[in-house]
C-alpha cells in the first residue's frame, strides 16, 4: 500500500474555498496511486468559532478552576469537528473517506494534559480503515492515555500528528500545507524579496523553526528525521511541490551538504535581556539564578556567563516576573526590554571562517548595535533592539545573497 500523509492547517480548512483547494491536492494524490492519510487542524484561527483559542476562550478567565484533563476534552473538539466536516466534503465530491479521532488512529500519549507526549503509535485500525477507503481524515493535535482520557499534544500539534502518522505508516511523503510556497529564506512579511527554498535539511528546518520561523513545528521535523520520512512544505493555493525537507540537499546520496553557506534568516521579537552582576565573592550566580527561573516556569535563552555577570533573555511576557524574582534574591539586574533575536541558519557555516565577521559588518553598516551574540555549528544569533529587527533581517538576507 503506497501511503502519503497530507496535513491541512486551520486557514486551509476554515471555509469551503480552502477545503475545495485541499480536495484538489487529495484527488491528485489518489490519482497517483496513493492512499491518503489526511490530518486536519481546527477550523480557522482565534475569533473563528471552532478554532482552538476560541474554544479556550469559552472558559471563565485565565484562572478557571477546570482541570487540564477537562481542558483537553474541550480543546480536542475543534479538530474532531473539522475532521467530520472535511470528511463530509470528501464524500460529497466522490472520495471514499472516513474520519477517525486521534485516539482511534492510534495515538497513545502520556497524561501530561494540554502538552502530552506521544509514547506509542498503534495504527492497526488506521490500516484497516485505509484498506477500504481512498482517504482517512484524522483529527490532529489529539490522542489518548492508556486509561482512555483524551489528551492534546501542544502548539503545533497537528504538524506533530502528521509526522507521527507518517512514521507509523511508513509514508512516502508527509505533506504540510500552509499559506506560503514552502520554506522561505526569511519571513516574506519582513523581507519582500524572500525566496522559497527547493530543498532544506532536517537540521536546518529544525533550527529555523526553533529560531522563530513558524512554517512547521520542530517536534514534527524531529519525528520525521528519526523515521527518515521526507517532508514537503507546500502551499494549499498552488500545485507546486514546495520545499523538500530531507537528510541532504542533493538527490545524490552521500553528497556534501555544505554547498550553501546560509539557508535562511529567522527572528523572534518581544524578547527581554537581563544582565545580572555577581555578588562580591559569589561564584555560582548562574546556578542560583537559573534554578529560580526554572522553578517559576520561565524559559531562559541566549545566555552568556562570565566571572562577573550572567546575561540571558526571556520572553517579553515573563519580564516582570523574572525581574521581581531577581530583586527578591538581592540582585540588581540591568533590564533591556523590546529586543529581538535574529538568527542566520545554515549547515554550511560549520568551520567556515569569516561568517560572524560578515554578520557584524553588515549590521554595523546599517548602524545596528549588537546587544549580544552566540553561535553553534549551524546557527549564529544576534540580539538587537526590536526597532532594528526588520533592517537587521534584511541586512543579513542581503549580505548572504539569499534572494538570488
From Swiss-Prot:
Record-linked InterPro entries: AceGlu_kinase-like_sf (IPR036393), ACT-like_dom_sf (IPR045865), ACT_dom (IPR002912), Asp/Glu/Uridylate_kinase (IPR001048), Asp_kin_monofn (IPR005260), Asp_kinase (IPR001341), Aspartate_kinase_CS (IPR018042), CASTOR_ACT_dom (IPR027795)
Binding site for substrate: 25-30, 52-54, 79, 130-131, 155-158, 299-301, 355-356, 369-370, 376-377
Catalysed reactions, as listed in the record: L-aspartate + ATP = 4-phospho-L-aspartate + ADP
Pathway given in the UniProt record: Amino-acid biosynthesis; L-lysine biosynthesis via DAP pathway; (S)-tetrahydrodipicolinate from L-aspartate: step 1/4; Amino-acid biosynthesis; L-methionine biosynthesis via de novo pathway; L-homoserine from L-aspartate: step 1/3; Amino-acid biosynthesis; L-threonine biosynthesis; L-threonine from L-aspartate: step 1/5
Pfam families assigned: AA_kinase, ACT_7
Mechanisms controlling activity: Diaminopimelate-sensitive.
Keyword Ribonucleoprotein: no
E.C. numbers: 2.7.2.4
Record carries keyword ATP-binding: yes
Organism domain of life: Bacteria
Alphabetized UniProt keyword annotations: Amino-acid biosynthesis, ATP-binding, Diaminopimelate biosynthesis, Kinase, Lysine biosynthesis, Nucleotide-binding, Transferase
Residues that, per the record, bind ATP: 7-10, 41, 178-179, 184-189
GO biological process: diaminopimelate biosynthetic process; homoserine biosynthetic process; lysine biosynthetic process via diaminopimelate; threonine biosynthetic process
Domain ACT: residue ranges: 344-404
Recorded GO CC terms: cytosol
Molecular function GO labels: aspartate kinase activity; ATP binding
Contribution to the catalysis (site feature) positions: 7, 79
Family: Belongs to the aspartokinase family.
Function field: Catalyzes the phosphorylation of the beta-carboxyl group of aspartic acid with ATP to yield 4-phospho-L-aspartate, which is involved in the branched biosynthetic pathway leading to the biosynthesis of amino acids threonine, isoleucine and methionine.
Assembly notes: Tetramer consisting of 2 isoforms Alpha (catalytic) and 2 isoforms Beta (function not known).
Protein name: Aspartokinase 1
Encoding gene per record: dapG
